[in-house]
Amino acid sequence: MTSQPHAQSQGSHFFVLTVEKPGLASATSSGSYTPPPGATRLDAFNVLYAELTGSAPALNRANVVFFSLEPNQV
């Protein structure tokens, strides 16, 4: 384990987003994200949801099971 920070190569926030189409498909995405200045939590959610659900036709209009967006620092 190292104590060197790697925040410069990561976004300002860490997210986890899980969506599901009951009986068809589910997916989870996680990573770092830097919202543009003035963006809201809703703005970030909409971008992340569109990226995840746009990656597979089976996820179109999927239900959100879990969403977390927090500052990416310990």
Enumerate the predicted regions with their spans.
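Prokaryotic Sec-type signal peptides and long signal-anchor helices
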Residues: 18-19, 49, 71
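N-terminal acidic leader/helix
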Residues: 2-37
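Compositionally biased, low-structure terminal segments
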Residues: 15-16, 46, 68
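Generic "edge-of-domain/loop-turn" microfeature
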Residues: 22-24, 38-40, 69, 74
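Amphipathic, hydrophobic secondary-structure cores in small proteins
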Residues: 27-52, 57
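Short intrinsically disordered terminal tails
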Residues: 1-6, 70-74
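Short, mixed-charge low-complexity intrinsically disordered segments
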Residues: 53-74
